[in-house]
Amino acid sequence: MLKYRRITTADDEAIAKIVRTNLERLHLDIPGTAYYDPELAHLSVYYNGTPTKRCYFIALDEVDRVIGGVGIAEFNGIEDCAEMQKLYLDDSAKGKGYSKELVAAAESWAKDTGYKKLYLETHSNLTVAMKLYEKLGFKQIEKPECVLHGTMDHFYLKSL
């Protein structure tokens, strides 16, 4: 079972590196993706700055090394909806079911916080992720008008 906790400033550098490494490998280190998000270098400040609306879970290995994470934040494009953001794992953590556990943690936190729906956006290069989202009950929707990451081309929603 995966060990995870809320992000701290000590995690910022490690999780930013994991996000950037994944996006570089997928040729998504381009404008319109999380690669260029201004808060990427300081995710703890962004998520902990509004703790009643946002949360970022850091996944840890058996020696407490950061191996990934997932964020949840308010999404203003759909009523009572949170957005699941920046679900990424280090290569050493892939293929072990950790993404599924992180999604479950995100869903649980969002539901407990009062959100009724969970939205996410992704890119067609992330085929493994899209299969996971669909398997976990996310339904593909049309692109919402308020999308900030213009490069994303697949959009999903799930009722909690």
Report each predicted region and the residues it spans.
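C-terminal "cap" of GNAT-fold acetyltransferases
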Residues: 25, 116-160
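Short coil/turn segments at alpha/beta junctions that flank glycine-rich nucleotide-binding fingerprints
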Residues: 26, 96, 112-116
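Conserved phosphate-binding and hydrolysis motifs of nucleotide-dependent enzymes
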Residues: 68, 97-99, 137
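Acetyl-CoA-dependent GNAT
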Residues: 2, 6-85, 90-91, 103-105, ...
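Active-site acidic-Proline motif in GNAT/NAT acetyltransferases
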Residues: 90-96, 124
